[in-house]
């Protein structure tokens, strides 16, 4: 979990920007979206192989 402490004389906008950056860097939002719904193992494998195929293409 990302935690941001507001520094002395720091605006709320700056603290929010730092928090958003830390959440993005940690991948918290992507992880929660990925786990929002159950994904069958066969669908996971298919998605993973398609992503590998896309990466290989370029």
Curated annotation (Swiss-Prot):
Keywords, alphabetical = Ribonucleoprotein, Ribosomal protein
Indicate yes or no for the key word Ribonucleoprotein: yes
Biased-composition ranges, Basic residues, are: 43-58
**Highest taxon in the source lineage:** Bacteria
By sequence similarity, the record places it as follows: Belongs to the bacterial ribosomal protein bS21 family.
- HAMAP family the record matches: Ribosomal_bS21
What's the protein here called?
Small ribosomal subunit protein bS21
Protein species of origin: Streptococcus uberis (strain ATCC BAA-854 / 0140J)
């Amino acid at each position: 979990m990302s935690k941001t402490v507001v520094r002395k004389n720091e605006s709320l906008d700056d603290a929010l920007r730092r928090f958003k950056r830390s959440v993005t860097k940690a991948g918290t939002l992507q992880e929660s979206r990925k786990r929002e719904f159950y994904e069958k193992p066969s669908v996971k494998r298919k998605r993973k192989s398609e992503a590998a195929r896309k990466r290989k293409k370029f």
